[in-house]
Structure formats: structure tokens, C-alpha cells
Amino acid sequence: QQAVEMAASQRLCILTGGPGTGKTFTTRTIVALWKAMGKSIALASPTGRAAQRLSEVTGKEATTIHRLLEFDPSKMRFKRDSDDPLPVDAVVVDEASMLDLFLAHSLLKAIPPTAQLLLVGDTDQLPSVGAGNVLGDLIDSSQVPVLRLTQVFRQAKASQIVQNAYAINQGNYPALESVSESPETDCLWLGAPEPEDGVRSIEAIVQELMPALGFDPVKAV
């Protein structure tokens, strides 16, 4: 409720938290609220895979930031900027930890002064490839409203992936079960005595195991 109220009232706010804390649910609720208020909403993410995931969880089309800002490769610049801003009332950016300085600056220039911006991300996940730690620096600045979700919900607690993520974040060794033992877990460990063996194992997983289990290696990795 606090996150929804913040998003409804602030021009810029950050929603952050570790895996399983409800960022996805909260984002979906905020988008639904804005939609009910009649706002024109743009959903975006730094990568295509993250944009696809955002679209799946919100039920609304999402795109990459480059596509949202209409990147022109012939001129190596974005068409959308302060002179030609986005025709929206609100913007949601997921996986904001991957925002670098250039992309963040370009995005902010293209958002109308009256529009709202929600940045969603986890500073402990993938950082930007380019220069800058935009999300982390904004959080540390204490100049932007931040809602940090900390409670891990019951369904997430049952996930070994979530448990291992928190263990690693706290400097502890993760619990890894061998694939050969075939335990009922969502996090399996495939050891290899030599680097070459590891490469062959990865090839076998991508080419054989994943398709056999119904996963698309291109989209799922």
C-alpha cells in the first residue's frame, strides 16, 4: 500500500528489494492504478528479455528503452528528447540497476516535466555495462523517495534460488545440490573437473537438456 501511494503521488520514486520481496506484484498494482486513473503509461527496460518479462507480468506492452526513445542508428542518437518528449503521463523502468549514465540521461530528457517515473530494480543484481551506477547512486543520495521491500514471501522462501541469492549476498556459501542426485529443487549444481569439461556440459544443457524440458535456450538463458 505504501509503494502504491508513493507512486501515485511522487514524480520520481524508486522501488527496490531482493528476489521474492514482491517487486513484480507491486509494479503490476501500480500500473493497474495508473491505468484506472486514465494515465498514458510507457513500460520499458534496458534489455529485450527484461522488457518481455515486464510485459508478461503487467499485461501491457513493454519495450526496450532504446526503442521507446526511438534510437536512430544513422545519426546515433535518440529521436525523443526534451524538444520532442514522450507522449505519456507515466513511465515504468524495470531492471533499473542496468541503467548507465548515458541511457539514464537520455531517458530523463525525454520524459515530460509533468510525467511520473518509477524505477524498479535491485542494486545487488546485474549492474550497467556502461559507466555509472545510476540506481545505487540515486538510492544513496537520499534525494529520491525510495521504498525498499524486505519481506520475502512464503512462496519465494521455498525457492532454493532465492535462498542461495540471499546467502551469497550475506557472504555465505550457497546450498548446491548435484544434478546427478536429481533432487526436487529449482537450483542444481553441475560440477566439472576441468574448464573444458564445463564448456561441454554447458553445450549439452543448452542443446539437449533445455529443449527436452520445453525451454527455449535463446529466450530462457
Regions found by a protein language model. Name each.
Residues 2, 6, 123-221:
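Conserved helicase motor core of P-loop NTPases
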Residues 8-15:
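Pre-Walker A (Motif I) flank of P-loop NTPase domains
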Residues 20:
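Walker A (P-loop) phosphate-binding loop of P-loop NTPases
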Residues 23:
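Conserved lysine of the Walker
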Residues 26, 30:
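Hydrophobic positions on the alpha1 helix immediately C-terminal to the Walker A/P-loop
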Residues 38-39, 88, 113-116, 142-147, ...:
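Short glycine-/polar-rich loops that comprise or flank the Walker A/P-loop
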Residues 40-45, 49-110, 151-152, 161-162, ...:
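Conserved P-loop NTPase motor core of helicases/translocases
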Residues 101-115, 133-138:
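Short, conserved "post-DEAD/DEAH" coupling segment immediately C-terminal to helicase motif II
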